Amino acid sequence: SDVCSSDLVEIAEAFDYAHELGMATILWCYLRNSDFKKDGVDYHAAADLTGQADRLGVTIKADIVKQKLPVNNGGFTAIGFGKTDERMYTQLASEHPIDLCRYQVSNGYMGRVGLINSGGESHGSSDLRDAVVTAVVNKRAGGMGLISGRKAFQKPMNKGVELLNAIQDVYLDPAVTIA
């Protein structure tokens, strides 16, 4: 947007002040740009574009960044923006969900700034499975957590608690390790 640069400066100043007060900062680094849809493909959750958004977040000193789990890659080349190298799509990443998420983690100083992925919208009967898969992908990629609001809180309490417990089980399980 026309005010993007001033918004980033304001947020960076707010984060500096929060840190002076001893507070942690968490930034939702979601993309919002109609140009990120090209030839019928939506790149709002592309690993390269979301990774760059995460990088902006850590540059302005977010302690944790929240990002959608990537579902594809190649956003920069598709929209014809940014300086890229073919190796970032061939040698440094694959289409595997863990590799795509790892690309996000690497844009946060190789995980020094924590990545939490969003749980996404509720789809009903597949929510438990989807949440566990997202948690496993995030943890195996080096991420630090998952926020699951709608999936957990738009259902009866016992089902929401079951979903949250399943997510916790992933992060507490020592057998689920970095890939």
PLM region spans:
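Conserved anion-binding
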Residues: 8-90
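Catalytic-face loop-and-helix region of soluble metabolic enzyme cores
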Residues: 68-179
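Short, small-residue-biased leader/transition segments that mark boundaries at the very start
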Residues: 2-5
